[in-house]
Each structure stands twice: as C-alpha cells, then as structure tokens.
Amino acid sequence: MKSIKLDIKKKNSLRLTKQEKKNVIQDFEKYGILKFSDITQSHKLLFNFINQFSLSYANDANRRPERFDNSRIRNVDAGNQEIFLHSETSFSPSQPEIVWFYCVNPGSDGSGKTVYCDGLELWRKLSPKYKMFFLENPIEYKLRVPINKKISGNKKKKWFLEYPGVRNCFLNYRKNSLEFNFIKFAVEKSRIAKKLSFANHLLIPLESEPQILGRGFLNKKKINKEDYNYITALAYEITEEITWKKNDLIMIDNLRFMHGRRKINKKNKSRDIVTIQTMISNFGFGSTTSLK
C-alpha cells in the first residue's frame, strides 16, 4: 500500500490539478490500494475529493445506514464479528470499481483492523491445477436483492435485467425484492494488461451475506474441503492489516483486492469507519499501465 500525504495548502479545498490527479491514478493502477493520511476533517471536502475520481456510485451501499447527511457515505457492516476476505458485492452486477474507507475514529484499542489481500499476487501463487479449475468453471450465485421502495403486485413477475450472466430474473412482490441467478468467474481482468486477479466472494461464509441464497459452480463441480482450506490459508498468508489513524482515507481497487475486518473487541465502542463505493470511475480502465 502506498501512502500519500497531500500538500497542506490543498486541505482547504482538496481540489487537485490535472497533473496531481494523473499522479494519483497512476499510483492507484500500479499499487491497487492507496492511503491518504489525515486528509481532512470535513466530510463535505472528503466527498468532493472522491467525486473527482467517480462517474457513478453503487446502489448496493444503500442497505447500510447513511452518514453525515450524504446518501453516498455509509456505515461499514454492523456488528463486532470478523468479516472474511471478499471483493465488495462481487456476487452481483452491482460490484463497484473502487471502495473507499474513511476513518472517523480508529477506536480505543485498535481492534477491528481492516485487512486486505492482493488478488494479483494470490492468483500468481496459485498452481496451474487451481488456475485451470477457476478459468473453466464459473460460479453461480442465487440472489435475492431487496428493493428500497415499496412495490405492489401479486406473486412473481418475469423481469429483464440487462447484464451479462443474469438469468432466471423475477420481481417478487411479496418479498419486495429482485430475485435472479448470477454467473461470474472467480478471476477478474485487472488494470494491468494481461494480468488476472483472484477477487471474489468465495472465501466468505454465506451467512455474512443475506442477499446470497446459494452459491456453487455452474457445471456442478466442487472444490473439496482440503483445497478450499489451502486457498483460504494462502490468501491470509499474504493478507496485510491497516493501522487506522483519524481522518485517514483508503482507496481500494475492488476488482483487484479483497478486504475484510478483524474481530472488534466488544469494549471498543468508539471505532467508526465509513465507506463510499464508486461504481464506475471517471478514468479509463488501465489508462496508465503499460502493455508489459
């Protein structure tokens, strides 16, 4: 992770020049995760800074409580439990390109550290045996996604969701939700040409994601417990922690990195991290990386 300290003069506006923005994008595409130390105390300036890199925002974040009177800034997942490695919403068409985390308060004892795993490195470390399996066998998720506004009708209605990999899509009036199956591979194209990243929702228990009703491989193939445990152990072997300080901002390439959280001590009631999810960035995918 590369740390960036913005010029103190910038703290009044956080408005970057074209060259400064280009430098941030170049570092982001190279490293995949950036830390802006003590960026600002102003939540308005924070959002204005993020807006310089965002074309649109992910709707999935709406399931979390809103913060600072801004519908784009949300709480992270509630509770004190450990959250296992995952790429945010990688089980659905709502997967954001960039996930931002901002530290309002690091907490009283440092528990609940955010963790991250580089999917590029993890994919590189996997043996050809596993790579062949994941390249040949896509995952199929069975989903039930809540709809924010109340809908009226009876039973279910066939629905059209225009996104590759979506099938069996229905509007469920009784559940006030959209239900569909989503087919997706466990590996992603990265911003670096000809390099793949292992960033997905395979390592997180299903009970952590109420939207996922089922998960399996499309061709009814299975990973045995020994192989699953090996891949999980390998992921955590290269996992790193973020030591939070007040007003730190982390920018994560969600198509490259998986992230999670250590367990929070029950006595640590002051930890406060918020998230913003950029659905589509406003700079070209892989625009600064060379064709190596």
Predicted regions and their residues:
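Active-site environment of non-heme Fe oxygenases that use a 2-His-1-carboxylate facial triad
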Residues: 1-16, 21-23, 68-72, 79-85, ...
